[in-house]
Design a protein with these regions (language model features):
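Internal maturation/activation junctions in enzymes
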Residues: 1-52, 123-127
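Catalytic alpha/beta core of large soluble enzyme barrels
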Residues: 47-189
Length: 189
């Protein structure tokens, strides 16, 4: 959505500005390295963005950075712990509507974490709670391209495609568009 694109830009512009400011403060305190003399900064680069799935699991109830959620409800099967994970924002809406019930969550699980079948959600809410595979993958490319101008290194961008279901020409087009839009790297499918 346009709102998501605007927020994406605001967030990464703010991160860039704050990281540059911090680098300037470090340069004031510790001096500029020889390679950066005259730039007023301590660091040559300040940002590289990766999906942080493992870190988000360890920290609990935080997002995996730029990575869309794979499901709104799933069982996380770790080496030492098996736990059920619910999208807490979705859970809050369901509670407000008196729909935070086992039957509803079971239906979400049966649909691979999707909520598109739930009549109790508005169309806008269904759009907000799309899973990684439900989001048009070009939208992920477009958001990555939009924020790249604020990132001085690169982003680790994952796309969710099933090569058995998506024609090779469509996959190729995603990669070409990403390259044309200045996205430096794409990973996993």
């Amino acid at each position: 959505s346009m709102e998501a694109m605007k927020k994406n830009s605001q967030i990464f512009q703010t991160i860039k500005e704050k990281s540059y400011k911090a680098s300037e403060e470090l340069a004031d305190k510790f001096g500029e390295p020889e390679v950066l003399e005259g730039y007023g900064r301590r660091n040559t680069t300040t940002m590289s963005v990766a999906p942080t799935k493992s870190s988000s699991v360890i920290l609990g109830q935080v997002s995996p950075s730029i990575e869309p959620l794979k499901a709104n409800y799933f069982v996380r099967d770790g080496a030492k712990l098996k736990s059920t994970q619910k999208n807490r924002f979705l859970e809050s809406i369901l509670q407000e509507r008196g729909k935070d019930e086992r039957e509803v969550w079971d239906s979400i699980a049966q649909k691979d974490g999707s909520v598109q079948h739930l009549d109790c959600l508005t169309d806008e809410e269904k759009e907000v709670f799309q899973t990684f595979s439900e989001i048009p993958q070009m939208a992920i490319i477009n958001q990555a391209a939009q924020r790249q101008k604020y990132i001085d290194q690169a982003q680790s961008i994952n796309i969710s495609l099933d090569p058995a279901e998506v024609p090779l020409e469509d996959i190729n087009e995603l990669y070409i568009q990403a390259w044309k839009k200045g996205v430096k790297s794409l990973y996993y499918q």
